[in-house]
Amino acid sequence: MTSEQLLRFKELLSVPTKTYSEDMMVSYLESVLNGMDGVTFWKDGMKNLYATKGLLGEDEFYPMFIAHTDTVHQLVDQINVLEGKSSLPPTFGKTFPSDEIHDILYALDNNNNPTGIGGDDKSGIFICLELLRTLDKVKIGLFVSEETGCHGSSKCDLDFLSDVGYVVQYDAPGGHLITEVCSGVRLFENDGEFINRVLPVIEESMGNKMMLQSHPYTDVSQLKMKSDISCINISCGYYNMHTPKEFISIQDVDKALKSGHAIVNELGYNKFKYEYVKPTYPKYSLWEDTEFEDDDVDVFDFESENIKIKEDSDGIVIKSLITGEEIFLYNEDCFDLYEYLQNKLSDSFEY
């Protein structure tokens, strides 16, 4: 990472943002995009940002890179971004050698207390912006409010995807992860051309044997469900995610950035189609909205509480008919619930 890139990264990291309180970040990103030559961008009603650079030739499609603009951390008056060195904690199935020391970025508030630096997903934003600066033909999407259910990307402008050939998100921790299934949605064809071509170049760029994983949810799953485009989510260098002691490996972010260039060099401006097949369940229906109607589902008694269950494309809503309270579970959490309820209620619960 060059010194100029590091300065840009630290400036981005110092911008406070939290789910539903993202105006400062969105305004900052608008100012950055305004200063980029050859880039056109716009903001939709959700405050998602869409940017395009370059003109396509005949039968070409844009590579698209995405990230999200919110973090889980509490807003503080000032985020002081500091440089340091650290070994890496165990992260999603990988333990790192204790003598493997990385240059890191971490954050303190004005009282010198640790505060979340927000690498999830400011690291992803940084990578998207740098790719926008350096690639000749590219699109990026920066989506709001991912952390509480991908609210921004669920309202993505589908016309923006009409000339996109593949989508790459940078929103996984560490430097060794690739998401293949997200919210129960497969992002690319198993053993298909897309993954067989990108996996070697990602591993070469990242310097790691990549682990394919299931991810609870992130924006790329929403785009996959709404399109016929192959998608992927890749590590972008943050550790101790969602804690005040979160930090970012500068080396891993730099490698992730290089992987973006390597992916475009390998795949070019082609389209890699992969159709999403919406799942169906016997004796159970899927609804597009999340509003309950009297005739949607049967009411049954569960542990002395009358509840209703309804499903949308991301998971299920459980509503207490006594208190009116609703909880939402994403698809990854639903399967254990189905099994538990089936065992608990035997034949009285149909799904």
Residue ranges and their predicted role:
Residues 1-15, 282-295:
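N-terminal hydrophobic or amphipathic helices/low-complexity stretches enriched
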Residues 8-11, 15-59:
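A non-catalytic alpha/beta surface segment that caps or lines the substrate-entry region
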Residues 34-38, 58-62, 131-139, 162-164, ...:
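Short glycine/proline-enriched coil/turn segments at helix->beta-strand junctions
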